[in-house]
Swiss-Prot record:
Binds 1 zinc ion per subunit. The gene is PNG1. This is Peptide-N(4)-(N-acetyl-beta-glucosaminyl)asparagine amidase. It is found in: Cytoplasm. Residues 364-375 have a biased composition (Basic and acidic residues). Gene3D superfamilies: 2.20.25.10, 3.10.620.30. GO terms for molecular function: metal ion binding; peptide-N4-(N-acetyl-beta-glucosaminyl)asparagine amidase activity. Keywords: Cytoplasm, Hydrolase, Metal-binding, Zinc. Specifically deglycosylates the denatured form of N-linked glycoproteins in the cytoplasm and assists their proteasome-mediated degradation. Cleaves the beta-aspartyl-glucosamine (GlcNAc) of the glycan and the amide side chain of Asn, converting Asn to Asp. Prefers proteins containing high-mannose over those bearing complex type oligosaccharides. Can recognize misfolded proteins in the endoplasmic reticulum that are exported to the cytosol to be destroyed and deglycosylate them, while it has no activity toward native proteins. Residues 345-375 are annotated as: Disordered.
Amino acid sequence: MSSQGNKYEYGELADKLILAYSKRRLFKAIGTKRDRQQQFSRLDNKDKRFISKLIDVSNSNEKHKIPSELDIALDCIDLAKIYEGVDKREYERESKAKDPNLIYEDFIVLELLHYFKHDFFKWVNKPECSRCKQSSNNIVPTGNSGPPSINPSEISIIENYKCTKCNIAVSFPRYNNPIKLLETKSGRCGEWVNCFIFILRALLGSQSQIRYVWNHEDHVWCEYYSLGLKRWIHLDPCEGVFDEPNLYCENWGKKMSWCFAFGETYIMDVSDKYITKSDKQINKLESVSSLKNIKEFIDTLNDDKLVRYYSNMALTASDENRNLMRLYQEVILIHNSEKFNKENKIEVSRTHNIPTGRQTGDAEWTKSRGEDGNE
């Protein structure tokens, strides 16, 4: 038999093995999904609270991916200014051999980071009084209240203040709906990341891979998968930094316990990527009772995502083999590759001249959070 015939047979055999593996993986995930409620009931209250938070974060990131909604984002930003900067970066790469591994998509991300921080979004320490337009010592906190019963703007909490100069109430609703944030263009790290991800998804298109990163010690950021660099890239829109996973521990001096990345197809514990100094690692057992239970339940949540992804494919395409092959290539292979390569340390490109300590938020606030760069 010719070598060409052997290659065809080997390729056909490989496809059969992949299809069989994908089918077994799918059936296992379906079975695990049925047992999820029972698995949750066996957890103690500490682990239940932690898992419930992960579920809430995961669910919130399933929203606002409809193309018609994403088009709203494109109508709200200065595309001409962004693409002018992208073209300049591409010219510098070609003429000065600068950033040779970055591709056009990476330049879009870099330029959006700059535009979003310097031209589009505003940081809020305290809300501004509607009458005197001041937001300094005249604004004093008076407590928090819950969201309204009808809540299209997805308010998580309302911070209440009083202007001592005007003697009027001032409120600061913490919006999660990115469409609302396109109007307000202001907030703290949660609002910044929600709005930034929404715009980034609109710019890069439906095939882009973007995920939300949640830290248990009250910070959030995001990542996208760079086809040029062939890995997940850290982005912090609040700070305007690109590919700086060492930022939090080594620059801010922040102590952390857990960091999770929430993508469309799976959740990944990325604590090792971002907690880069052993003296900044908070014992994970301070927030949970069983590391094993948390890992197993995250596996269950990932099974849910896998089943949902396959079900959505099956709604539009009836070819089972094709759907199983797509499931392998678009979900299983990527997840397994990241899971098995977590221990490989990747040399990251560093942004030049990053100042020490967190730049967003006032000095008292960053110091209270252990993010001011002082050990």
